[in-house]
Each structure stands twice: as structure tokens, then as C-alpha cells.
Curated annotation (Swiss-Prot):
GO terms for biological process: [2Fe-2S] cluster assembly; iron-sulfur cluster assembly. Disulfide bonds: none annotated. It comes from Schizosaccharomyces pombe (strain 972 / ATCC 24843). Its main location: mitochondrion. This is Protein isd11.
């Protein structure tokens, strides 16, 4: 089975895009590990190891997608490093801050 360059790039981008749905620490870890893995695959000369790396990455994408859905089911507070988002929760926090300053 030959893997096209387009498939590899799409897989890489999908993993990075899906990783952004995680909280800060998991997101940064997953992005860093993904970049490192694909840098290794870029210089891999053995086709069998390359294809196995792609299969592992496809499994990783499935795991990340499943886990991001599970994480999204639970209401969580953002870490300080993430800042306030533009969701309804962020708007409520901003309105309370403005009211307390008045």
C-alpha cells in the first residue's frame, strides 16, 4: 500500500486541528508529539516503517477525535494561560467583571 503525500499532509493537519479542541496542557503535548512523529516519518527510508507510522497516526487521530468529544461533554473552566474565550461563559465573566468595577 502506497501512501500519497497529500494523504500524509491531510492526516497531519487533521491531527493538529483536532488537537486544538483539547485543554491547554493536552493540546500542547499532542501538537508537540505529532510534529516530532511526522519529522521522524519525513526522513524514514524504510517503506514498511513509514506505512506503520502512518497507520499509528491514523489511530491517534481516531483517539484524539473520540477524546475531544468526551472532553466537550463536560463543562470545564479554562486555565489562566488560555484566557477568556468568546463563548457565552466568557461573556458572563466579562459582564461580572465590568459590574464589579462600577
Amino acid at each position: 500500500m502506497s501512501v500519497s503525500k497529500q494523504h500524509v499532509v491531510r492526516l497531519y493537519r487533521n491531527i493538529l486541528k483536532t488537537s486544538k479542541l483539547f485543554p491547554y496542557t493536552y493540546r500542547e503535548y499532542t501538537i508537540r508529539r505529532t510534529r516530532d512523529k511526522f519529522k521522524e516519518l519525513k526522513v524514514e527510508s524504510d517503506p514498511a516503517k513509514f506505512e506503520q507510522g502512518i497507520k499509528d497516526s491514523e489511530k491517534l487521530l481516531e483517539i484524539i477525535q473520540r477524546q475531544s468529544i468526551i472532553n466537550g461533554m463536560y463543562n470545564k473552566r479554562n486555565l489562566v494561560v488560555e484566557g477568556i474565550d468568546d463563548t457565552a461563559e466568557g461573556e458572563v465573566k466579562k459582564s461580572f467583571e465590568n459590574a464589579s468595577q462600577s
